Structures are given as C-alpha cells and as structure tokens.
C-alpha cells in the first residue's frame, strides 16, 4: 500500500513536467502565430495602400475625362453661339441694306430735283445767280459734312471709352474668377483629403478594436477551457474524498475493535497499562474528530460549488432572455430596410419618368417649327411672350406633379413611422453588460457614415422624446442639405465656366474680340429699338413681365433642386441603413457564437498566502481554528511508525496521511489556477475599461472633426453664394446696357439649359463614382473577412494540434 501511495505522489510530478513541456510548445506556437498575424496585417496594410493609390489614379482619370467633356461642351456651345450670332448678323445686314437702299432712293430723288432746278437755272438765269446758288450749296454741304463728322467723332470716342471699360471689366472678372477658382479647388482638395484621412483612420481604429475584442474573446474561451479542466480536477478530488471517507470508516471500525476488549476488563486502581493506553486513544479520537470536521467542510465546499454552478446556469438563461430583444430589433431593422428599398425603387422609377418627360419636352421645344417673319416689334414681343408663357406653364405643371408625388410619398412614410411607434410595446428590462460588447460602441461605429436614426433600442423609456428630437434633427439636416446642394451647384457652374476659360484662352480671346465688334454694331440697332419702345410705352410693362417670369423660373428650379437633394438624402440614408444592418447582423452572429461557446461567469476567489496550508485556510474560514493540518499530518506519520498498532491500522493511517497530502497539493494547484484566472479576469476588465476610454476619446475627436468640417462647408457655401451674387450683379450692371431684354432672356435661357445639362451629367457621373467606390469598399471588406476566416481556421488547427499533443503527453 505504501508503494501505491508513492506512485500516486510521483504521477502529479510527471504530469507537471509534461504540462510544462506542452506549455513551452504552445508558447513557441503562439509566437509563430503572432509573427504570421503581424505579416498578414502588413499585407493587409499594403493592400489598402494599393487600393488607395488605385482609387487616386481612377479619380485622376475621371477628372481628365470630365475636363475633356467640359471642353467639348464649351466648344459645342461656342459653335452654337457663333451660329446664332451669324444668323443675327445676316438679319442685321439685310436690314441695313434695306435702309441703305431706302436712303439711296431718297437721295436720288433729291439729286434729280436739284438737277432739274439747275437745268432750269442754267436755261433762264445769268451767271451771277448760278455762282450764288453754287456758293450757297457748297456752304450748306460743308455745314452738313462738319456736323456729321463731329457726330461720328463723338460716337467713335464714346465707343472707344466703352470698349476700354468693357475690356478692363472683363480682365478683372477673369482674373478674379481664376483666383477664386484656384482657391476653391485647393480648399475642395484639402477638404476631400481630410475627409478621406478621417474615414481611413476611423476604419482602421474600428478594425483594430474589433481585432482586440476578438483576441480577448479567444482568451476568455481558453480560460473557460481551463476552468473546465479545473472542474475535472475538482471531481477527481471528490472521488478521492469518497475514498478517504471509506478509509476513515475503516479506521473507526478498527478503533472500535481495539477499544472493545479493554471495556470488558474491569477497571483497577493501580493498572499501569490502562494508564499508558488512554492518552493514545484520546489522541486518535481527537484526530478522527478533526478528520471528520475536514470531511464535513469539504462536503460544504462541494455544496457551495454546486450552488455556484446553479447560479451560472441561471445567468446563462438570463443572457438568453436578454438576447431575444436584440434579435427582434434585428428583424425590425431588416423589415425597415426592405421598406426603404421599395420606396427607393419607387423614387427611381419616378425619377426615370420625370427625366423622360423632360427629354420629351425638350424634343418638342427643339422640334417646334421656326417662327414666321414678324412685321412689327409688337408681333415679335407677343410671340416671344406666348412661347415663354407656354414653356413656363409646362414647367409649372411638371414640377407641380413631381411635388405632389413626393409629398404623397413623404406622408406615407410619416404614417408608417407613426404606426410603428404606436404598435411598439413599451418594455423596460434591466440589461446586464456583456464582456466585450457595448451597444453604444456599435452606434458610434455606425454613426460615422449614418445620418438615419436607427440606434435607438425598442426598450428605451423615453421613446417619444427621442422621436421628437429625431424629427427636428431630420428637418434641420434636410434644410442644411438643400442649402449645401444649391451652393455646390453654383460653385460647380462657376468652376466649369472658369476651367473652360483657362483651357481655351486663345479661343475665348478671339470670341471676345468678335463679340465686342458685334456689340458695337448692335448698339445703333438697340437705340432704335429703345426709341420705338419708348414711343409705344410698352418697355416698362414688358420688362416687369419678363422679371416675373424669371422669378417664377428660379422658384421652379429651386424646387427641382430641393427634390433632387431630398432624393439624394434618401439614397444616403438607405445606404447607411444597409451598412448598419450588416454590422448588426455580424455583431449578432458574434454574440450567438460567444454565447454558444462561453457563458458569463462570476468568480469570487480569495488567494492564499505562501507557506500556509490551503486546507488550514479553508478550516479557518469555516470557523475551525483548533485544527492544524501540518501537525495533523505529522501526527499521522508518527502513528504510522508506532509499533503498538496493528498492521491494518498502520496502513490505514499511512494511506490517510498520503491522501491528505495529495488533497492539499491538489487544492493548492486548484487555488493557484483560480488565482491566475482571477488575475487574468482583472486584467481583461482593466483592458476593457481602457478600450472604453479610448473609444470615448475617438468618438469625441470624430465629433470635433465633423463639426469643423461642417463649419468649413458652411463657410465655403457662404463665400460661393456671395461670389455668385456678386458676379450676377456685375454682369447685369455691365452687360445689361449693351444688350436688349430679349437677347438677355435668350442668353439666360441658353445658360440655364447648359447648366441643367451640366448638372445632370455631373450627377450621373457622381452616382457612377459612388457606385464604383462602394463596390471597391465591399470588395475590400470581403477580402478582410476572408483573411480573418483564414486566420481563425489556422488558429483552430493550431488548437487541435495542441489538444492532440496534450492527449499524447497525458
């Protein structure tokens, strides 16, 4: 029996040596895995850099294509303008020739009359009369010539001064436009770079934090495995305790057998043998009582462990109950995403219908038969007014239909939201925090790109207040987006004009010279037209009608821009909702996997001091302070060496001492493992606190950067609006005097048409760019997920190999 006890003492030492060797192997494997992970991270960073470079290259190519398109459009517009000017020039030349022929006829009549008078004078008058008439005719001709020459010289001087002023104004405007365009470009590029940097940094931080959370989850999983092994050790200890109980029962029976013959002998006053044996019996009885007390304490500890196990099972059930609202929320978000998809499809269909109608209207306008020759200015004005009124009426009807449809869609969405809010039950559960999961962190991760309010759980107590605040915020955001969109359209139009001027400087210089020459030609015609209009008294009324039509057209354009901005905002919100739904699904899967693998647990561990027996500390905790376990083991050893006892009793006592020593060693190992686990849990909690602090700092920094960007955008919008207004005022002041109202309106309509075409093309181009970038981002995310799956598979393979090696060593 003593050999068996020694073998049992040697087995743990061999197990410890094997475990140490396995631990060293695992450490080496861990270092190799960490090196591989670092290499994979470097590869991922290289891939991201390459993707950013490719995106930059694609952006540059797109910008070049855009500039080429702009130059082509400018050339087309210039050609159209030249054609129109050529037609106007031909008409004016014809009118001038008609007027010249009329004046020639008048002069011919006067010459014939004078010739007849001269012939009459020549026939019936003398030389004196002839000379007097010739002198008078010469003087009159000289006076007329002088007056006409003075008038022409004065007109030439006025035209030269006007030309100089126009040249100076044009040069100043071109320089100012170039400077402002350069400033706007530089600011736009800097803002775009800052936005891309912020997005890249936020994505990098989110990925890093997710990797840290996954690593901590794996550590927790390994710790839970160690706990399972420790529970196995506890079960082994329970089995050993049962064996101890049996051995103690045998010891008690042996003591009863020893004490029974002594009781039968009657007591004598002077018996020395009874006096010698009584202290040994008392010692044995004390030791047996102490052993019984330790056994009871071990049983109590076993019951406590069972209670803790039951508590852990209750905690698992509670966590399962708490996961149910998250799943319900995910389902609600999926339904909402589907509804938004349906509404977006409807909006896209409506946009297509509107674009078709617009193209049909343009085709009708372009295919409209040419105007007949009008006999008077009144007919011309009436025809122009009728055409403009018809065009404006069509635009008004079209825009009114679009506005009605959009208001209906908006009312439908509002009704659906109200119905959802009224149908939602008010729940107020108390949610315990999960390890490695924070709902606010998920909301902060999705709020960098999302503007839609989906981060509110259905179980919050202040739903109505949050909904009112969200409605106010959405209205403010809508107004801000409309302002930003209008300002960007204006800035885009200005940039298009300025870039075209920079590219085709020589062509524009030639066109400018031609326009100035034509302006000088048209001035006389304009004065005649103004005189005729002043005579008829219709100039002010006509101008007022024109201004009213212009205002109405601007209002319609603003409505169109608002509707387009709302459509763009809805698309962005839908994309944000999709991204948030994907993130929530991914997080839900992670939580389900974590719940499946490792339920949460609560350890209350009191580490023991070095040099003190673990059983002694346990007895002191239970209130038994008289027992000294090292002394008890020594006494058992002494009893085992005592020769007065029988062999069976000695063997039982030796076995009890060995079992107690082994139990003490096992308990020390268990408590050491528990202390290490507790320390690891404390470290993980501290890491989680640091992670939460870092997350809060990052959120604050992101909010600050967003506010700075919003302020910068608002400032840019204000500057662009002031620049646009100033340019409009300058052009009206400087060129309004040179052209007639009709020509100004024609130029404005042509510019508006061109601007609409440019805006439509720019929107299509921006949509294409956004789609391509979203595809690139999705590909990058897919690549990252594949790499993470590969790393998980490698780690699982490594764990399987480690378990196999542990089994072999065991």
UniProtKB/Swiss-Prot annotation:
Pfam families for this protein: JAKMIP_CC3 (PF16034)
Coiled-coil blocks: 13-102, 148-178, 207-244, 280-419, 468-597, 664-808
GO cellular component: a single term: Golgi apparatus
Transmembrane parts of this sequence: none
Main localization, broad class: Golgi
Tree of life domain: Eukaryota
Keywords: Coiled coil, Golgi apparatus
Gene Ontology molecular function: any one: microtubule binding
Annotated compartments: Golgi apparatus
Residue ranges of the region described as Disordered: 261-280, 437-465
Reported tissue expression: Highly expressed in brain, moderately expressed in thymus, spleen and lung, and weakly expressed in kidney, liver and peripheral blood lymphocytes. Also expressed in adrenal and pituitary glands, as well as testis.
Residue ranges, compositional bias (Basic and acidic residues): 261-274
Signal peptide segment: none
Protein family according to the UniProt entry: Belongs to the JAKMIP family.
Designated name of the protein: Janus kinase and microtubule-interacting protein 2
Naturally occurring in which organism (per UniProt): Homo sapiens (Human)
């Amino acid at each position: 029996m003593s050999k068996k006890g020694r073998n049992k003492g040697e087995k743990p030492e061999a197990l410890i040596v094997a475990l140490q060797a396995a631990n060293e192997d695992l450490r080496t494997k861990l270092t190799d895995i960490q090196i591989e992970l670092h290499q994979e991270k470097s590869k991922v960073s290289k891939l991201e850099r390459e993707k950013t470079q490719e995106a930059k290259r694609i952006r540059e190519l797109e910008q070049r294509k855009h500039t080429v398109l702009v130059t082509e459009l400018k050339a087309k517009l210039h050609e159209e303008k030249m054609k129109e000017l050529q037609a106007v020039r031909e008409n004016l030349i014809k009118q001038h020739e008609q007027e010249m022929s009329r004046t020639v006829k008048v002069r011919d009549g006067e010459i014939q009359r004078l010739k007849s008078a001269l012939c009459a004078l020549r026939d019936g008058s003398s030389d004196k009369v002839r000379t007097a008439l010739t002198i008078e005719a010469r003087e009159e001709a000289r006076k007329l010539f002088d007056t006409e020459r003075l008038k022409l010289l004065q007109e030439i001087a006025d035209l030269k001064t006007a030309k100089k002023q126009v040249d100076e104004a044009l040069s100043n405007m071109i320089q100012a436009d170039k400077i402002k365009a350069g400033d706007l470009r530089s600011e736009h590029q800097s803002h775009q770079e800052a936005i891309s940097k912020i997005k890249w940094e936020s994505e990098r931080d989110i990925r890093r934090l997710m990797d840290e959370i996954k690593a901590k989850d794996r550590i927790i999983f390994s710790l839970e495995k160690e706990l399972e092994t420790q529970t196995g050790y506890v079960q082994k200890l329970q089995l050993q305790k049962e064996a101890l109980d049996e051995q103690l029962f045998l010891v008690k029976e042996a003591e009863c057998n020893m004490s029974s013959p002594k009781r039968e002998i009657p007591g004598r006053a002077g018996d020395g043998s009874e006096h010698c044996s009584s202290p040994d019996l008392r010692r044995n009885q004390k030791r047996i009582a102490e052993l019984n007390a330790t056994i009871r304490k071990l049983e109590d500890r076993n019951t406590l462990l069972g209670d803790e196990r039951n508590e852990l099972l209750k905690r698992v059930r509670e966590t399962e109950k708490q996961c149910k609202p998250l799943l319900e929320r995910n389902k609600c978000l999926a339904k909402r995403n589907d509804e938004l998809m349906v509404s977006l499809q409807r909006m896209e269909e409506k946009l297509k219908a509107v674009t078709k109608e617009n193209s049909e209207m343009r085709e009708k306008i372009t295919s409209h038969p040419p105007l007949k020759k009008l006999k008077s200015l009144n007919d011309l004005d009436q025809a122009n007014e009728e055409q403009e009124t018809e065009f404006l009426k069509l635009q008004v009807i079209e825009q009114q239909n679009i506005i009605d449809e959009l208001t209906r869609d908006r009312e439908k969405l509002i009704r659906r939201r109200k119905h959802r809010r009224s149908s939602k039950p008010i729940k107020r559960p108390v949610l315990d925090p999960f390890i490695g999961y924070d709902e606010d962190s998920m909301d902060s991760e999705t709020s960098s790109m999302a503007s839609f309010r989906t981060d509110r759980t259905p179980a919050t107590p202040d739903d109505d207040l949050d909904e009112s605040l969200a409605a106010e915020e959405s209205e403010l955001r809508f107004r801000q987006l409309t302002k930003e969109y209008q300002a960007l359209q204006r800035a885009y139009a200005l940039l298009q004009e300025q870039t075209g001027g920079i590219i085709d400087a020589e062509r524009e210089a030639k066109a400018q010279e031609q326009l100035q020459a034509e302006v000088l030609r048209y001035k006389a015609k304009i004065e005649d037209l103004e005189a005729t209009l002043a005579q008829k008294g219709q100039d002010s009324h006509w101008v007022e009608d024109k201004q009213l039509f212009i205002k109405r057209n601007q209002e319609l354009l603003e409505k169109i821009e608002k509707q387009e901005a709302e459509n763009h905002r809805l698309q962005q919100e839908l994309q944000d909702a999709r991204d948030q739904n994907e993130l929530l699904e991914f997080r839900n899967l992670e939580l389900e996997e974590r719940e499946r693998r490792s339920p949460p647990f609560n350890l209350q561990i009191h580490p023991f001091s070095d040099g003190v027996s673990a059983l002694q500390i346990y007895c002191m905790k239970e209130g038994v302070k008289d027992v000294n376990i090292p002394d008890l083991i020594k006494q058992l050893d002494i009893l085992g060496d005592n020769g007065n006892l029988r062999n069976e009793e000695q063997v039982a006592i030796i076995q009890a001492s060995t079992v107690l020593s082994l139990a003490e060693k096992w308990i020390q190992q268990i408590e050491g493992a528990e202390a290490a686990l507790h320390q690891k849990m404390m470290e993980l909690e501290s890491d989680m606190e640091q992670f939460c602090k870092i997350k809060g700092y990052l959120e604050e920094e992101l909010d600050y950067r967003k506010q700075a960007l919003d302020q910068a955008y608002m400032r840019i919008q204000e500057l662009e609006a002031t620049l646009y207004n100033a340019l409009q005022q300058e052009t009206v002041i400087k060129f309004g005097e040179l052209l007639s109202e009709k020509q100004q309106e024609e130029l404005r309509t042509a510019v508006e048409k061109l601007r609409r075409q440019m805006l439509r093309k720019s929107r299509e181009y921006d949509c294409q760019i956004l789609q391509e970038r979203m595809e690139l981002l999705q590909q990058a995310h897919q690549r990252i997920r594949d790499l993470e799956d590969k790393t998980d598979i490698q780690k699982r393979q490594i764990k399987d190999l480690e378990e196999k090696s542990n089994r072999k060593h065991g």
